[in-house]
Each structure stands twice: as C-alpha cells, then as structure tokens.
A protein has these predicted regions:
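Conserved pre-catalytic core of RNA-dependent polymerases
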Residues: 1-166
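Active-site palm subdomain of RNA-directed nucleic acid polymerases
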Residues: 46-59, 162-196, 200
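Intrinsically disordered, low-complexity regions enriched in proline, serine, glycine
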Residues: 22, 52, 102-103, 121, ...
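Short, conserved micro-motifs composed of acidic
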Residues: 140, 227-229
Length: 229
C-alpha cells in the first residue's frame, strides 16, 4: 500500500490528485492516518534537501543539530568580542505576530517556484492545502463554510520546511546578506541571527539599525507578516 502510494505520488502527474484519492479509500481511520503520515514523511525528506541548501547558517530554526542555545551562544560571543575591541553594538529582537498563521498560500507557491523547488514537490505540497475549508461555532450558532487561504498546517511535518522557505524569501529581499551594516569579524559581516520567525538584527550604529529594521518591516508586510520589536 505504501509502496504504491509513493509510486503514484512521485511518478505520476500530481495534478491528477490520484494520491489524494488513494488516501480516501474506505480503510480504517488508523490505517488512513499511518499511510498519510508516511506519505508526508517521504515528501518532507525530499523537500528538506532543498531547504538545507537554501537556508544560510544564521537560520537555526527546525534544523538538525541546531537550536536556540546555539544562537544565544553566538550572540554572547559577539557581545564579548564587541567589548574586547571596544565597539558599540545595537540589537533589535523581532517577533512576528502569529507568523505561522499568516503564511499566504498563493505567495508560498510562488516563493517555492522562485527558489527553485521542483514543480513536482511544489504541486504535491499545494495539493495538501487545496480545498481547505473551516466553520466557526459561536454562541449564536455556526458560520457558513469558508475557504482557508493562509497559515501552514499545525502539527504537519512539512510546515517547518515551508515556513523556513517563506521566511528566507523575505530576508533575502531585505538584502541583509549584501548589506554593509553589521558586526565585522575577521571572516565575515554578521547582521542577523534567526530561529524560525524569531530574528535578531545587530549592527554597530543606531542609524544602521533603523535602516535595516525599516527594510525588514517593509518586506515582511509584503508577505503578510507583521514584525513586532
């Protein structure tokens, strides 16, 4: 069953949505859940290869062998070096409001294409989100069904990959890698550290920090993310 599912998913036209039909066959709920989980794991493993290639070292969110402690240690090291060489250093800590809920689906598929993700993987990912609807129950009854056009799926193994690519696209458009502003070390210029949506900007002057922050807020707004700092 699983072998057949992988074959249908990766070696046929995903637009035919045959793999989705297979998941709707009248099997038990337990078997259905296990099968769909295996399918998502296969898709996640293939997508992760491209995520690892696209993401820079400053992004530690949802990456194997990396964590918040690494980013804290990096920032502490930068502070120590700034004190050692008697340099000013300015930080801005950015937290996006409901970042994972604000990912625009149409924007996401365009980003995957621009970042060189194979059409097959993009199409399979898009099919997971196709036709999603929700209904809200209130004290006065329930609303009509409505389409869901934003947000990555909570608890889905693909969500970290998709969000990291979405966030990386925003940061690339801010031009952080090319910016001269930042903390100069012997080997490179560092102006940000990230853990998923949590972003730290760091520069040597207040004016540089203001310019970087305004650029980040501008590009984030274009992708429906609201930066809080």
């Amino acid at each position: 069953m699983v072998t057949g599912l992988e074959k249908v998913s990766f070696h046929s036209n995903p637009k035919e949505r045959q793999w989705q039909i297979m998941l709707k066959l009248p099997h038990s709920c337990t078997h259905l859940t296990h099968t769909s989980t295996v399918m998502l794991k296969i898709l996640q493993a293939r997508l992760q290869q491209y995520v690892n290639y696209e993401l820079p070292d400053v992004q530690a969110g949802f990456r194997k062998g990396r964590g918040t402690r690494d980013q804290i240690a990096n920032i502490c090291w930068i502070i120590e070096k700034a004190r050692e060489f008697q340099k000013n250093i300015y930080f801005c800590f950015i937290d996006y409001a409901k970042a994972f809920d604000c990912v625009d689906h149409n924007k996401l598929w365009k980003i995957l294409k621009e970042m060189g993700i194979p059409d097959l993987l993009t199409c399979l990912s898009r099919n997971l989100y196709a036709g999603q609807e929700a209904i809200v129950r209130t004290g006065h009854g329930t609303t009509d069904w409505f389409q869901i056009g934003k947000g990555v799926r909570q608890g889905c193994v693909l969500s970290p990959c998709l969000f990291n690519l979405y966030a990386e696209y925003i940061m690339r458009n801010t031009g952080l890698e090319e910016a001269q502003a930042g903390i100069k070390t012997a080997a490179r210029n560092i102006n940000n550290h990230r853990y998923a949506d949590d972003t730290t900007l760091m520069v040597e002057s207040e004016e540089e920090l203001k310019r970087l922050l305004m650029k980040v807020k501008e590009e984030s707004g274009k992708s429906w993310l609201k930066a809080q700092h």
